[in-house]
């Protein structure tokens, strides 16, 4: 029997990634597919592909930006995502928390890590590019914050995040 899977290539810095992750369980239940989460650096993808964040891309087209925001609000309403809030510190440099996702994957805790960090970013509005905030949050949510953060500095962890990002670009992600 062939197993169906859906790969989500994501960065915590994207509010759309959060929204997608919250809407995916219904699709996965309906299709029987398994979710494969692949952490990457959205900024690295943008740089490699010449793409830009919508707020920059559409800065000179206010009607387009307003429409993008309207569609986001519609999506939030359609999927009942009332806890979502734009992070007041947005955009957030996600390098450390994305490396943390690589560590969590290595330690078999990626799903819990993704749930927790998504909540911190897009529900609680924490400044998730501040090492102290990250360590405190992780420690309060079932992780060894200092140990996980120490591992984000390991060359293998750094290399895996770069590898994931480069592989995403090679596959056409923009």
Regions found by a protein language model. Give the residues of each.
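C-terminal cap of thioredoxin/glutaredoxin-like
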Residues: 2-34, 38, 109, 116-174
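Structural alpha/beta surface segment adjacent to cysteine/selenocysteine redox centers
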Residues: 19-121
């Amino acid at each position: 029997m062939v197993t169906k899977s859906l790969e989500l290539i994501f960065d915590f810095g994207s509010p759309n990634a959060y929204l997608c992750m919250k809407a995916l369980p219904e699709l996965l239940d309906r299709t029987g597919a398994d979710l494969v989460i692949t952490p990457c650096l959205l900024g690295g993808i943008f740089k490699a592909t010449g793409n830009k964040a919508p707020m920059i891309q559409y800065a000179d087209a206010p009607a387009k930006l307003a429409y993008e925001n309207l569609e986001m609000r519609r999506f939030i309403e359609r999927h009942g995502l009332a806890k979502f809030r734009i992070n007041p510190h947005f955009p957030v440099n996600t390098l450390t928390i994305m490396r943390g996702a690589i560590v969590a994957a290595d330690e078999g805790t990626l799903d819990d890590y993704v749930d927790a960090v998504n909540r911190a970013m897009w529900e609680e509005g924490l400044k998730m590019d501040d090492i102290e905030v990250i360590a405190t949050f992780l420690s309060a949510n079932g992780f060894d914050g200092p140990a996980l953060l120490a591992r984000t500095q390991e060359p293998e962890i750094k290399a895996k995040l770069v590898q994931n990002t480069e592989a995403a670009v090679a596959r056409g992600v923009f």
